[in-house]
Amino acid sequence: MTVLHSVDFFPSCNASVAIEPRLPQADFPEHHHDFHEIVIVEHGTGIHVFNGQPYTITGGTVCFVRDHDRHLYEHTDNLCLTNVLYRSPDRFQFLAGLNQLLPQELDGQYPSHWRVNHSVLQQVRQLVAQMEQQEGENDLPSTASREILFMQLLLLLRKSSLQENLENSASRLNLLLAWLEDHFADEVNWDAVADQFSLSLRTLHRQLKQQTGLTPQRYLNRLRLMKARHLLRHSEASVTDIAYRCGFSDSNHFSTLFRREFNWSPRDIRQGRDGFLQ
């Protein structure tokens, strides 16, 4: 497995924060690093396999990656990221207690993937741009300024996560996307889902297409197919069982959609013929 080292990314041995844009981020094999990072998805789509679990990521997704987590990117489509790297929550010169603002693992569950709406994403970009502008400056005031900006970034992300509610359609769409990640195998009635998240069906279609580039049903099918591909690679369940577990009532229809999406059959994936990045 590839290991990325801080010496290759931080501008100096004293720097506590570094900005690493990926515009775009291509498919990248499983790796980990000796530093932590906050991955901010600007736009595009892709699959983020995080500690073996696949997540669909789109504009507004924020991922918190620790130094012992392993992850990879695959099936990327114009995926543009900005990575905010930091050595460790306790390696800041002017800040203490940052760990309390980061996601906390509880009973083995780590909430690694958050979502923010477009207005918050714009504020995030501004903070990151300010940090990036100061990267070449190593004096104490500049170091303190970068660390304060990092603190502001964490506060903004945490506040927007805690306050993500039904006050506007962008927030409701983010909640809907998070709901689909957990309920992708359910029979989805889009009229009922639109009502559940207080969206008109037209607004749901328009905003989801704007954010993901896909219609709601196309997005759901891709999500199901991604989950199925993960199970084909990492479980012994039969193709038919996997199809049903991922929300497909007809295994033949599943195989047709699968080949159309990936240009490989489920059997090809099971046998590793696609040359999956390890």
Curated annotation (Swiss-Prot):
One of its GO terms (biological process) is rhamnose metabolic process. It is found in: Cytoplasm. The keyword Cytoplasm applies. GO terms for molecular function: DNA-binding transcription factor activity; sequence-specific DNA binding. Residues 191-212, 239-262 bind DNA. GO terms for cellular component: cytoplasm. Keywords: Activator, Cytoplasm, DNA-binding, Repeat, Rhamnose metabolism, Transcription, Transcription regulation. Gene3D superfamilies: Homeodomain-like (1.10.10.60), Jelly Rolls (2.60.120.10). The record marks D241, D250 as: Interaction with sigma-70. CDD domains: cupin_RhaR_RhaS-like_N. PANTHER family: HTH-TYPE TRANSCRIPTIONAL ACTIVATOR RHAS, HTH-TYPE TRANSCRIPTIONAL ACTIVATOR RHAS-RELATED. Activates expression of the rhaBAD and rhaT operons. Binds DNA as a dimer. This is HTH-type transcriptional activator RhaS. It comes from Shigella flexneri.
